[in-house]
From Swiss-Prot:
Residues 213-223 have a biased composition (Basic residues). Homooligomer. Interacts (via N-terminus) with protein M. Interacts with protein F; this interaction occurs on the surface of infected cells. Interacts with protein SH. Interacts with host CX3CR1; this interaction modulates host immune response. Residues 1-37 are intravirion. This is Major surface glycoprotein G. Belongs to the pneumoviruses glycoprotein G family. The gene is G. Residues 98-110, 148-158, 251-263 have a biased composition (Polar residues). Residues 67-263 are virion surface. The keyword Secreted applies. GO terms for cellular component: extracellular region; host cell surface; membrane; virion membrane. Keywords: Disulfide bond, Glycoprotein, Host-virus interaction, Membrane, Secreted, Transmembrane, Transmembrane helix, Viral attachment to host cell, Viral immunoevasion, Virion, Virus entry into host cell. Glycans are attached at N85, N97, N234, N251. Residues 87-111, 127-158, 200-223, 238-263 are annotated as: Disordered.
Length: 263
């Protein structure tokens, strides 16, 4: 195509050059014959023709340069994508049927199969091909589901079942008429009030703790004073036995003295 266009342009330029030659020769002949008005008209027409031809050639060259500069589009082929979790499960009948779906050649429409199992999701894309080119749709984001643990399904031994526990309604004793079961369950409002009054204990206000540890100097001073008082009392008050013996000796001396005087 490019060689054909260049050959066509060369032919047109050659014809224009020949026509301009003939036109110049004709103008020179008219100038020799003293026809100045006709010469001026012819020159103005020639100038207009040359300007038009130059603009046309410039447009042609610019268009051809742009076509050469544009790169040719290359065919793009995309590969089928498959998202699969790292922890794969053993194949089962359901998984095998869902993962291995048969394709329908080059004219098969776009299909999207999702297989959801415990903790995993499989995405399979079959792409539509047309004339050797495959175009894939935008790939969806795979959302991982946390694995279901067996501990949640089986309750632990520590947990207790409180379904058997029932709260009995209030039954007054006035309704019961000789029924032992009713009397065992009934309650008097006065008894319940008394029980509550007896069971309620007033809260004790804690006293502020203001204990001061005695210093060594104060304890020593107290003990020294006690020892001094104890020593003084022992020195001033003699024992009872000594006082009685002293009195007895004085009495005997007074009794013996008048005898000596009489003698």
């Amino acid at each position: 195509m490019s060689n054909h266009t260049h050959h066509f342009e060369f032919k047109t330029l050659k014809k224009a050059w020949k026509a301009s030659k003939y036109f110049i020769v004709g103008l020179s002949c008219l100038y020799k014959l003293n026809l100045k008005s006709l010469v001026q008209m012819a020159l103005s027409a020639l100038a207009m023709i040359t300007l038009v031809s130059l603009t046309i050639t410039a447009i042609i060259y610019i268009s051809t340069g742009n076509t050469k500069a544009k790169p040719m589009p290359t065919p793009t082929i995309q590969i089928t994508q498959q998202f699969q979790n790292h922890t794969s499960l053993p194949p089962t009948e359901h998984n095998h049927n869902s993962t291995h779906s048969p394709t329908q050649g080059t004219t098969s429409p776009h299909t999207f199969a999702v297989d959801v199992t415990e903790g995993t999701r499989y995405y399979h894309l079959t792409l539509k091909t047309q004339g050797g080119k495959t175009k894939g749709p935008p790939t969806p984001h795979a959302t991982r589901k946390p694995p279901i643990s067996s501990q949640k399904s089986n309750p632990s031994e520590i947990q207790q079942d409180y379904s058997d526990f029932q709260i009995l309604p209030y039954v007054p004793c006035n309704i019961c008429e000789g029924d032992s079961a009713c009397l065992s369950l009934c309650q008097d409002r006065s008894e319940s009030i008394l029980d509550k009054a007896l069971t309620t204990t007033p809260k004790k206000t804690p006293k502020p703790m203001t204990t001061k540890k005695p210093t060594k100097t104060s304890t020593h001073h107290r003990t020294s004073l006690r020892n001094k008082l104890y020593i003084k009392t022992n020195m001033t008050t003699p024992p009872h036995g000594l006082i009685s013996t002293a009195k007895h000796n004085k009495n005997q001396s007074t009794v013996q003295n008048p005898r000596h005087t009489l003698a």
